[in-house]
């Protein structure tokens, strides 16, 4: 971000950082220390522990199996040569997407991009291949001294480029999409008082997609919370949603969409995201129409194909009573 009057100076500084970064020893050690401090903190965060364990089981030897921050050993071993090589692989014209918003014309932007990116190589290093989601139904318990257990659960999901993504999004809004009106919140929190919060979310990535959820509950009640979640997963898979739930979910999803466009930065990020996924240029104008077009039959069909109560894997971090690593409880 920069003011129009500072454009030339800002672009010159940014160009220097992109084309010829110094990777000075002091900068490398400063950032290395910051990353390693974060990694140490992660070892005491139940949510982070659960997430790393889930990804390791879900993605095996794929890069998605490891944290973006690396490990203590891998970060400690990084050299300046490693950073230079990674920069050469990543910063290339075939790896870049641009979104620009504000006081600039297309012609001016073209000149700016030539100045900023013109010296980059045409192609970068190889991209990771698509990942197979390998996690199977079951429970993994990671002992952690705390009065409350955290559970991250999920199975294979659905990609943003899948024609059934919109029905899946509506389905998730009903099931556990962050609203106090969701089925999971109603059944796990409101009716039984097992948690302060439970949610589910679609997690599509470039090379794989998962459908995940999160719940925290007292150690002596987490088993019951898991049983209720599995029941609701199965009910939605078998029955879909009701007409009222469909209407309310679509109203929420379409009504919340304009709130994403609340500044130049968010708009630019949306434009880049559209390009990365390969969405058409009219996506913003037509997106809510596609949500409104979702029918009860669409949601029921997708629920039956997507939701797999027996395929859910729960990673539980804490001291859960009555739960052990192994198959899902009967």
Give residue ranges: language-model regions:
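Charge-rich, well-structured scaffold segments of protease-associated domains
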Residues: 1-124, 141, 167, 191-192, ...
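Generic non-transmembrane alpha-helix signal with a bias for helix starts/N-cap capping motifs
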Residues: 181-182, 267
């Amino acid at each position: 971000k920069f003011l129009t009057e500072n454009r030339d100076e800002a672009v010159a500084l940014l160009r220097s950082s992109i084309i010829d970064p110094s990777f000075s020893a002091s900068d490398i050690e400063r950032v290395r220390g910051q990353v390693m401090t974060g990694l140490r903190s992660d070892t005491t965060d139940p949510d982070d522990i659960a997430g790393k364990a889930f990804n390791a089981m879900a993605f095996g030897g794929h890069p998605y199996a490891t944290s973006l921050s690396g490990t203590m050993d891998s970060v400690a071993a990084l050299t300046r040569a490693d950073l230079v090589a990674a920069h050469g692989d990543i910063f290339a014209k075939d790896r870049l997407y641009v979104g620009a918003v504000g006081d600039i014309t297309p012609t001016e932007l073209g000149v700016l991009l030539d100045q900023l990116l013109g010296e980059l190589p045409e192609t970068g290093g190889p991209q990771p291949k698509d990942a197979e989601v390998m996690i199977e139904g079951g429970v993994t318990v990671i002992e952690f001294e705390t009065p409350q257990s955290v559970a991250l659960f999920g199975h294979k999901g659905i990609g943003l480029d899948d024609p059934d993504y919109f029905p899946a999004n509506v389905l998730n809004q009903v099931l556990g999409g962050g609203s106090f009106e969701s089925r999971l919140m109603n059944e796990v929190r409101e009716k039984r008082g097992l948690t302060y919060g439970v949610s589910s979310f679609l997690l599509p990535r470039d090379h794989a997609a998962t459908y995940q959820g999160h719940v925290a509950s007292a150690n002596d009640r987490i088993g019951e919370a898991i049983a209720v979640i599995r029941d609701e997963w199965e009910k939605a898979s078998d029955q879909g949603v009701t007409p009222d739930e469909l209407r309310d979910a679509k109203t929420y999803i379409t009504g919340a969409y304009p709130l994403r466009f609340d500044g130049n930065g968010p708009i630019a990020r949306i434009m880049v995201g559209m390009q990365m996924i390969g969405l058409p240029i009219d996506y913003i104008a037509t997106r809510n129409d596609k949500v409104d077009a979702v029918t009860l039959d669409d949601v029921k069909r997708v629920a039956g194909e997507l939701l797999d109560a027996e395929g859910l894997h729960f990673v539980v971090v804490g001291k859960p009573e009555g739960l052990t690593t192994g198959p899902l409880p009967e």
